[in-house]
């Protein structure tokens, strides 16, 4: 099973809590995290894009780096790990995104790919005059399909004459083309999102569900397999989990409860309010805004000792259609170290990493 890391491009990572580590995003922090991840055999690193935060006393996600430029910098200081940047498709034309990706492909020597997002948080785009109107909530995957087709055309042939409702290319050219097959990611869980991923993406990211319920996402993975049957493609699932691990189950649980006790209720309320504006929202957004565990936007959470977390991650690997997991931590630097030293060696699904190290 592949292991990736969802790097903290925004302040405080993925914890909306005053009891979690409070920090600003910097290149140096993310370089340290990704270089450590590469050293421990992580397969990929992905950065999101966020253009406006949730406010509250923790100013959650009010401070963010930009995804493509961050990953370009990380490409220059890594050598093996795959890197994915996120493009907010309302902000960057596909031909420009294609050229930016080709540039980072050159920097990374073929280790780059793109995560495509349509945008669900209206204030991010409204502040720049880029919000196309609330009807976009209903047409965004048609828009994204055209965007992806232009990217595929330009990377495959170096030119595009695509004509659609949203984009019109006239002998549009991009050269040099990427040296490696450029992978696309989407994070759809709605019916429309799944259909898009099955048609255009190489991987589909989905949320894990609940606390210590590692296989609860299985119905989502199954829906993607069913969508694949309609397109004849083999698009696999990568699942998002937060790891809260310690020497004992009790110590890990105490840390998780302490984080929840410091929840920034104002920021969480803002997330719920803005998320409700999207009446067509798929389960991803509904899950993020659910009050049950909104302190970490309701991503799946694995809490326990090193052995307990290793066992649960192996359970994730057993779900049909699962390519890998993407991990977040309360403390990213220590979390990556603890994963590499104390969790990964106990995982059956990562035995190949130990074997590779023995060969080296």
Swiss-Prot record:
| CDD domains given in the database record | Alkanesulfonate_monoxygenase (cd01094)
- What molecular function terms (GO) are annotated for this protein? alkanesulfonate monooxygenase activity; uracil oxygenase activity
Enzyme Commission identifier(s): 1.14.99.46
Which GO BP terms sit in this record? alkanesulfonate catabolic process; nitrogen utilization; uracil catabolic process
Q: Which family does it belong to?
A: Belongs to the NtaA/SnaA/DszA monooxygenase family. RutA subfamily.
Database matches in NCBIfam families: RutA (TIGR03612)
Q: Summarize the protein's role.
A: The FMN-N(5)-oxide reacts spontaneously with NADH to produce FMN. Requires the flavin reductase RutF to regenerate FMN in vivo.
Keyword set, alphabetical order: Flavoprotein, FMN, Monooxygenase, NADP, Oxidoreductase
Q: Does the keyword Flavoprotein apply?
A: yes
Q: What class of enzyme is it?
A: oxidoreductase
Q: Where is the signal peptide?
A: none
Q: Which reaction does it catalyse?
A: uracil + FMNH2 + NADH + O2 = (Z)-3-ureidoacrylate + FMN + NAD(+) + H2O + H(+); thymine + FMNH2 + NADH + O2 = (Z)-2-methylureidoacrylate + FMN + NAD(+) + H2O + H(+)
Q: Name one Pfam family in it.
A: Bac_luciferase
Q: Name the InterPro entries for this protein.
A: Luciferase-like_dom, Luciferase-like_sf, Pyrimidine_monooxygenase_RutA, SsuD_RutA_monooxygenase
- In its UniProt entry, what is this protein called? Pyrimidine monooxygenase RutA
Question: In which residues is FMN bound?
Answer: 49-50, 115, 124, 140-141, 190
């Amino acid at each position: 099973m592949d292991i990736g890391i969802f790097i903290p491009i925004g302040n405080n990572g993925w914890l909306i809590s005053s009891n979690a580590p409070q920090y600003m995003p910097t290149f140096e922090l993310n370089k340290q995290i990704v270089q450590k991840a590469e050293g421990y055999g992580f397969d990929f690193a992905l950065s999101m894009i966020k253009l406006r935060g949730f406010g509250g006393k923790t100013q959650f996600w009010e401070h963010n780096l930009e995804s493509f430029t961050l990953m370009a910098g990380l490409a220059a200081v890594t050598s093996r790990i795959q890197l994915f940047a996120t493009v907010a498709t309302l902000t960057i034309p596909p031909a420009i995104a294609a050229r930016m990706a080709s540039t980072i492909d050159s920097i990374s020597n073929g280790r780059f790919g793109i995560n495509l997002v349509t945008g669900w948080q209206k204030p991010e785009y409204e502040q720049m005059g880029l919000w196309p109107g609330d009807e976009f909530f209903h047409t965004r995957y048609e828009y994204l399909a055209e965007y992806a087709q232009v990217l595929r055309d330009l990377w495959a042939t170096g030119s595009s004459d695509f004509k659609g409702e949203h984009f019109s290319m006239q002998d549009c050219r991009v050269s040099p083309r990427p040296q490696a097959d450029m992978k696309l990611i989407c994070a759809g869980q709605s019916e429309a999102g799944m259909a898009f991923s099955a048609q255009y993406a190489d991987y589909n990211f989905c949320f894990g569900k609940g606390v210590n319920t590692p296989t609860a996402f299985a119905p989502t993975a199954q829906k993607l397999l069913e969508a694949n049957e309609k397109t004849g493609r083999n698009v696999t699932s990568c699942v998002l989990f937060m790891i809260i691990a310690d020497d004992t189950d009790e110590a890990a649980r105490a840390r998780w409860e302490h984080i929840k006790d410091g929840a920034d209720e104002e920021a969480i309320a803002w997330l719920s309010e803005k998320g409700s504006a999207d009446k067509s929202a798929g389960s991803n957004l509904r899950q993020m805004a659910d009050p049950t565990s909104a302190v970490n936007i309701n991503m799946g959470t694995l809490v326990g000792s090193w052995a307990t977390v290793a066992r649960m991650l192996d359970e994730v690997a057993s779900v049909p259609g699962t390519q890998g997991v993407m991990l977040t931590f309360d403390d990213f630097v220590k979390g990556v170290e603890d994963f590499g030293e104390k969790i990964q060696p106990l995982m059956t699904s990562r035995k190949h990493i130990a074997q590779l190290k023995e060969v080296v």
